[in-house]
Amino acid sequence: MALKNYKPVTPGQRQLVIVDRSGLHKGKPVKGLTVGLTSKGGRNNYGRITARFQGGGHKRTYRLIDFKRRKFDVSGVIERLEYDPNRTGFIALVRYDDGELSYILAPQRLAAGDRVISSAQSVDVKPGNAMPLAAMPVGTIVHNVELKPGKGGQIARSAGSYAQLVGRDQGMAILRLNSGEQRLVSGTCMATVGAVSNPDHANVSLGKAGRKRWLGKRPHNRGVTMNPVDHPHGGGEGRTSGGRHPVSPWGKPTKGRKTRSNKATDKFIMRSRHQRKS
């Protein structure tokens, strides 16, 4: 879908660029595929802030998305594409031939009336079809990729994202991710063909602070604007540079500091995303 550029008729419309969602469903979601969602405001069960700069925003209903795609060999037709406030990509409502309804992530170039199928064997390589990585031809663009068989897709789920199958090695599939990382994933893991819809999300300009508040995002204050009691960069007469390498409010180095500590899965990373891209 295209972008909508606004003329500065009002201050809030100056530099406003949003995604044109006129082609999406305008009604409510399927009630049986939704659950309630409680706004946490970045607080944990003690009421303490654990995620800063969150809170407010429009009330949301959570849509139950089928990330596993394990309804094998039952074809379905795309009823409609819908907006989902809980993610950046769009979602698609699938009506399977046995009558069941389900939401899936909508890939690019998927439209109402198209048919999709999921299978444990090889099926047509077209957007929306799901199959194990071992059944896909090398070079396929995929999204919603599982890291563990049966757990559901975890990789390449946000707007416009995808991974590419670049090879195979002893029952494992080699994926190139958006970050440049190349990693091994079991060939029995499911993935869906295509890239996630709404690639123009990266070009959105909200135009005013209030539109960010509607999304549940609160103002993000820099450390150098704070007092010394609040942040290691705080204080000083006039504007200062912080006087030290960038750190978090708790004194931990930030901006480039590596934080990965899962040594058990290091063996699956063939090329780090930190290596210079060739």
Curated annotation (Swiss-Prot):
UniProt entry tagged with the keyword RNA-binding: yes
Keyword terms of this UniProt record: Ribonucleoprotein, Ribosomal protein, RNA-binding, rRNA-binding
Signal peptide segment: none
Keyword field contains Nucleus: no
InterPro entries attached to this UniProt entry: NA-bd_OB-fold, Rib_uL2_dom2, Ribosomal_uL2, Ribosomal_uL2_bac/org-type, Ribosomal_uL2_C, Ribosomal_uL2_CS, Ribosomal_uL2_dom3, Ribosomal_uL2_RNA-bd_dom
GO cellular-component term (any): large ribosomal subunit
SUPFAM superfamilies xref list: Nucleic acid-binding proteins, Translation proteins SH3-like domain
GO process terms (BP): cytoplasmic translation
MF terms (GO), sorted A to Z: rRNA binding; structural constituent of ribosome; transferase activity
Segments for region (Disordered): 214-278
Family: Belongs to the universal ribosomal protein uL2 family.
Reported function: One of the primary rRNA binding proteins. Required for association of the 30S and 50S subunits to form the 70S ribosome, for tRNA binding and peptide bond formation. It has been suggested to have peptidyltransferase activity; this is somewhat controversial. Makes several contacts with the 16S rRNA in the 70S ribosome.
Quaternary context: Part of the 50S ribosomal subunit. Forms a bridge to the 30S subunit in the 70S ribosome.
Name under which the protein is recorded: Large ribosomal subunit protein uL2
Organism this protein belongs to: Chelativorans sp. (strain BNC1)
